[in-house]
Curated annotation (Swiss-Prot):
One of its GO terms (biological process) is adenine biosynthetic process. CDD domains: PurM. This is Phosphoribosylformylglycinamidine cyclo-ligase. The gene is purM. It is an enzyme of class 6 (ligase). Pathway: Purine metabolism; IMP biosynthesis via de novo pathway; 5-amino-1-(5-phospho-D-ribosyl)imidazole from N(2)-formyl-N(1)-(5-phospho-D-ribosyl)glycinamide: step 2/2. GO terms for molecular function: ATP binding; phosphoribosylamine-glycine ligase activity; phosphoribosylformylglycinamidine cyclo-ligase activity. It catalyses: 2-formamido-N(1)-(5-O-phospho-beta-D-ribosyl)acetamidine + ATP = 5-amino-1-(5-phospho-beta-D-ribosyl)imidazole + ADP + phosphate + H(+). HAMAP family: AIRS. InterPro entries: PurM-like_C_dom, PurM-like_C_sf, PurM-like_N, PurM-like_N_sf, PurM_cligase. It comes from Thermosynechococcus vestitus (strain NIES-2133 / IAM M-273 / BP-1). It is found in: Cytoplasm. Keywords: ATP-binding, Cytoplasm, Ligase, Nucleotide-binding, Purine biosynthesis.
Length: 341
């Protein structure tokens, strides 16, 4: 009897590390010290920071993984994993420095795991952060064969006097909504229930030539480069929110600071057809849709009205549509103007 007969192949794990080494190397930044395979990853703080603060965030992809595994498509969920972490770190104005991943699986399937890590590396490249290290845990008897879970961890850096913490937000500021790429990585338990209860197929094409499964697996948009570009241009951003689980009502107030709310106009941006379709087919109220999904707004920027045009021009250069979707008002941390659940 040996470890391999118990379901853990240490040799396959070592081979996997060698296979992904080129993917990891593509993401490296000048600040990274050493290479892949050590007990820990090392990274310097970039030169030029006066009073650097380290910023950390961790997240997963949720049950979107169930869909990826059902469709045997594994090359995009790694992008989702990075996006969920770096977009969070970005909200306080930080520059993402490095990323760590944790993959747990029933059996290490090299082709599948290579696809996952390729997506993680692609996400890191898009965010400008190094894939500094990770852990792949083979857990037979805990996860079924073909099943895996992902978790990510990101560290960024920001000047202490440039942290966006809500105190800069003022009544009268505009809420600028940046377009999402689709569902992103939230609400998939409801999506899967709708598809299951209505006896639909992920291969169905209710909204055009692209299958429902492909629409839902569209990776989460990474907003790092356009936001960093806006900040470097001196656009006076007062606050930012990553619109994830709980939608706009749950996430927008987190960047407004004390004594402020937001009044939004749900007619101010085009809600993508996928969200309307989910509401109609699943008999989900518009209010519940807003409380569950991003509804086409994946990230919000709060800034003075005088800066809106410059910000929209900046984001458009990165291929991202944006709309003034509301204003900041005095209040107790609420989002007003959206349909009730």
């Amino acid at each position: 009897m040996d470890y391999r007969s118990a379901g853990v192949d240490v040799a396959a794990g070592r081979a996997f590390v060698e296979q992904i080494r080129p993917l990891v190397q593509r993401t490296q930044r000048p600040e990274v010290v050493g290479g892949l395979g050590g007990f820990a990853g090392l990274c310097q703080i970039p030169k030029g920071y006066r009073q650097p603060l380290l910023v950390s965030g961790t997240d997963g992809v949720g049950t979107k993984l169930k869909l990826a595994q059902a469709l045997d498509r594994h090359n995009t969920v790694g992008i989702d994993l990075v996006a969920m972490c770096v977009n969070d770190v970005l909200t306080c104005g930080a520059e993402p420095l490095f990323f760590l991943d944790y993959i747990a699986c029933g059996r290490l399937a090299p082709e599948m795991m290579n696809a996952v890590v390729a997506g993680i590396a692609q996400g890191c490249e898009a965010a400008g952060c190094a894939l500094l290290g990770g852990e792949t845990a083979e857990m037979p008897g805990f996860y079924a064969e073909g099943v895996y879970d992902l978790a990510g961890f990101c560290v960024g850096v920001v000047e202490q006097d440039q942290v966006l913490d809500g105190t800069q937000v003022q009544v009268g500021d505009v809420v600028l909504g940046l377009a999402s790429s689709g569902l992103h990585s939230n609400g998939f338990s409801l999506v899967r229930k709708i598809v299951s209860d209505r006896q639909l197929s992920w291969q169905d094409t209710p909204l055009g030539p692209t299958s429902l499964g492909e629409l839902c697996l569209e990776p989460t948009r990474i907003y790092v480069q356009p936001i960093r570009a806006a900040l470097s241009q001196g656009i006076p951003i007062h606050g930012m929110a990553h619109i994830t689980g709980g939608g706009l009502p749950e996430n927008l107030p987190r960047c407004l600071g004390q004594g402020r709310s937001a009044h939004l106009d749900p007619q101010a941006w085009p809600i993508p057809p996928l969200f309307h379709w989910l509401g109609e087919v699943g008999n989900v109220s518009l209010g519940e849709l807003f409380n569950t999904f991003n509804m086409g707004i994946g990230y919000t920027v709060v800034l003075p009205a005088s800066a809106v045009a410059a910000a929209q021009t900046c984001f458009a250069k990165w291929g991202i549509e944006s709309w003034p979707i509301g204003t900041v008002v005095a209040g107790a941390g609420e989002v007003l103007g959206l349909p009730a659940a």
